[in-house]
Regions:
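ATP-binding pocket architecture of kinase catalytic cores
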Residues: 39-200, 204-206
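Juxta-kinase regulatory segment immediately upstream of eukaryotic protein kinase catalytic domains
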Residues: 2-36
């Protein structure tokens, strides 16, 4: 196992700062997740913690829960509702996305908004050159990756119910403005190079 595998793959006990009311979650799942039946065990995934991610397991099923982190958040950051909406829409168009079981935007359940999706087994390849695989296996993975990307770009976002998702046009301008504001909101000290970059980017955006 590589150092990256050991650090970022698998699960660990839930960190104290990220624990929540398990009984409240079980009540919500009983009401909103078809086929759910406890008892439930909860572990925290080692990686992917911009939005804390948990593995939920019962005697008959496994799920993944992603939630907003607790505490004060920057505006528009950690929008788990957007993740849920896009993956649900793509899955309904036949794209290989995990099944979405439900979204909860009621902070009173476990403290922050969250959604629950199916747990899907998979492999993580840290090196894009795939040096440990046979040439024919590498070729198959690259071909599958290209086919999946082509499938994604072939989906009609209007037909998928995402016609009102985001704002059309001026993506770079809006992104630069949003991230500049968020940087300033989180700034703890003045960094001249960053201020210069914030001034430079709008003038040179594609």
């Amino acid at each position: 196992m590589s150092q990256l595998d050991d650090t970022y793959t698998g699960t660990k006990p839930v960190a104290d700062a990220l624990k929540f009311d398990q009984a409240a979650l079980e009540r919500w799942m009983q009401a909103h997740v078809e086929g759910f039946a406890g008892p439930l065990t909860i572990e925290q995934f080692k990686g992917g913690q911009s939005n804390p991610t948990y593995k939920l397991e019962t005697p008959k099923a496994r799920y993944v829960l992603r939630r907003k982190p607790p505490g004060k958040l920057l505006p528009s950051a950690h929008a788990v509702d957007r993740e849920y909406r896009v993956m649900k829409a793509l899955g309904e168009q036949g794209f290989p996305a995990p099944h979405m079981f439900g979204l909860c935007e009621d902070d009173s359940v476990i403290g922050t908004a969250f959604y629950i999706m199916d747990f899907v087994e998979g492999r993580i390849f840290w090196d894009p050159y795939l040096p440990d695989l046979k040439p024919e296996d590498r070729a198959a993975i690259y071909d599958a990756s290209n086919a999946t990307l082509a499938h994604l770009h072939s989906i009609d976002h209007e037909a998928a119910g995402l016609g009102d998702y985001g704002k059309p046009g001026n993506y770079f301008e809006r992104s630069i403005g949003r991230w500049s504001k968020q940087y300033k909101a989180a700034e703890t000290q003045t960094i001249a190079a960053m201020d210069k970059l914030i001034e430079w980017l709008p003038e040179h955006a594609p």
